[in-house]
């Protein structure tokens, strides 16, 4: 099985965001997440038609999966006071914004959240690629 290195940030963006008129693809040779939109759409789609086995379309996940990941992550936080803040953030309107805001004040936990989310998203993708002999390694980004 060969290993494909994929940017955590790029994969999360592709799998969690719904940008009208944009479709995201994973290049299964390079690990690059390739957006097809507006000005580059024809060029990217021509490349995909030429090498269809090289590209995998990345469909955004259902919104509920993001909420479920937040609930699961909050349970893993060892500091009771932060766990309580996160649990409060995931009830009521604006859960995604409130959850992110609470974590941004805790850089170490925010980084752990990014990796946790990446692993959740990659889990679905791993299953799709295993049949082709491809394993995914998430590469953390420095931001």
Predicted regions and their residues:
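Residues in flexible loops and secondary-structure boundaries
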Residues: 34, 41, 64-66, 107, ...
């Amino acid at each position: 099985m060969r290993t494909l290195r994929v940017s955590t940030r790029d994969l999360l963006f592709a799998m969690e965001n719904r940008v009208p008129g944009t479709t995201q693809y994973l290049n299964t040779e390079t690990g690059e997440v390739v957006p097809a939109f507006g000005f580059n759409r024809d060029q990217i789609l021509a490349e995909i038609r030429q090498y269809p086995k090289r590209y995998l379309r990345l469909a955004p996940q259902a919104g509920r999966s993001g909420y479920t990941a937040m609930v699961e992550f909050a349970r893993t936080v060892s500091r009771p006071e932060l766990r309580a803040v996160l649990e409060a953030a995931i009830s009521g309107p604006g859960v995604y914004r409130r959850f992110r805001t609470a974590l941004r004040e805790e850089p170490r936990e925010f980084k752990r959240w990014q990796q946790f989310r990446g692993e959740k998203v990659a889990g679905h993708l791993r299953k799709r690629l295993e049949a082709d002999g491809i394993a995914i390694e998430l590469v953390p980004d420095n931001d």
